[in-house]
């Protein structure tokens, strides 16, 4: 009886290992138009031309019909046992080309520790699934299939740990994989594989990886830029995850990583979610996490499926008594918030709204002068006396720029030297035709009154008459004129002396 139970346990373990499979279907397939230049698939009369340097392994399809192959200087192709290549077949009217050549595009490599390289057909990865569970686990089966170029970058890979490797339909053993990596063919299939050690495991591990903390840095190096900013305060990071999330984490230490204990916790939490009708609102992920340094634990990640609203946090806190065990820890994130909206952005938005409102009011005041409230705004803008903020120490210049345009002859004006544009600001212009005093304009210095024009014309005429008087002729004085001048001077002196004597008497 005990023997039957032992066989049953091993069968269940084998079933679990078989279901845990990572698939690689990346690369552009040989029969995909995107793998060729100008999206031109090779016809039966076409010559297939490889790039000069083709750093990849290309598995050719089982049956192709072409005119020939131009191999690269460096590269590799893989032919299956049942593959058939037909050269020089008949032309097909539906497939013709002018050049009779088809050019393959250069291949692209995929990183082994990149979660985007692998898929799991047995389950769908959610946004809160740890990144270390999206790459091949240490005991998982890895299937590499397809007819596209194969090239894997083993950057930061120290141990290539697998459960089983199936390449192009063939199972690859640990010994053959070690030999393949060291050969020339393996250098096209695996980059940076000089010091990589190959290890195979068969389900004897706890969790996805043997030491998850050693893989965090190389794996997160490939996905760190893809992490979204969490919309909550104090986000949490599950074990084996590179990105912070909003939700709750329930961790229970364990010594035996059995599938039964994991399913028991999954069923317990799922039943509570169904009882509260939260299946469409709350997401759940339960998995073992193993570490030689920190020990093993069973981790349950509970998050909101849609926008974070603390529903997952409330659910775990309300039902905490259902799984209250020794050593169980609960980590929760804070309240939701939008990280894209900060205090400075709010202030900027309010300032822009106030500025738009102010400009709108000024425009309305300009086009609605009859409004009893809006018509005061232009006066407030043009009146500098309202701009004196004594408590700020600001003063307005008294020598205004347009003082020379003030009408000094208008009524109410001041012609005294002490007057200024600020004192006579009520009168800024005078309209000579209507006799109105304009308070929102200035005099045009080129515009004069009628009387002023006549007076200016009269002054101009008098000046012309003065300029028209003939000038006196001048010439050199001769000796006779000099003698006459001396005689006149003597007569004047004698007359002055006689007058002086009479005054003395």
UniProtKB/Swiss-Prot annotation:
Pfam families in UniProt: Amnionless
Give one GO molecular function term: cargo receptor activity
- The disulfide bonds in this chain are none
Q: According to the UniProt record, where is the region Disordered? A: 451-482
What this protein is reported to do is described as: Required in the nephrocyte for normal uptake of proteins and elimination of toxins, and for maintenance of endocytic trafficking structures. May function together with Cubn.
Segments passing through the bilayer = 345-365
Keyword presence, S-adenosyl-L-methionine: no
Entry's InterPro entries? AMN
Residues spanning the signal sequence: 1-20
Report where it is expressed, by tissue.
Specifically expressed in nephrocytes.
**What is the membrane topology noted in the UniProt record heading this document?**
Single-pass type I membrane protein
What name has this protein been given in UniProt? Protein amnionless
Q: Which ranges of the sequence are coiled-coil? A: none
List the GO cellular component terms.
Answer: apical plasma membrane; endocytic vesicle; membrane; receptor complex
Gene encoding it? Amnionless
